[in-house]
Amino acid sequence: MKPDRGQVAKWLGAPTDQVGSVNDPRTAEDHGVKWNEMWVYKLPELGFDRVVLWNRYDLLGVWRVFPGGRTEPEKLPEA
């Protein structure tokens, strides 16, 4: 079972920025998935940023974004 929004917020804390919203009907596509809300975590001390993509209340995935644009999926603990 995928974690819900509350669990992700508990694990990762509050995002630095947010793009879109749970109720936004517009979608975008990144990392091979269509999403309508992105949580952005600026983490210069770790050498990467983190993005969490949602489609409404469904978690689509978490990615590390490195300088230069390289990305890699990141695993979260199971709910």
Question: How should these model regions be labeled?
Answer:
Residues 1-79:
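Residues within mature, well-folded domains
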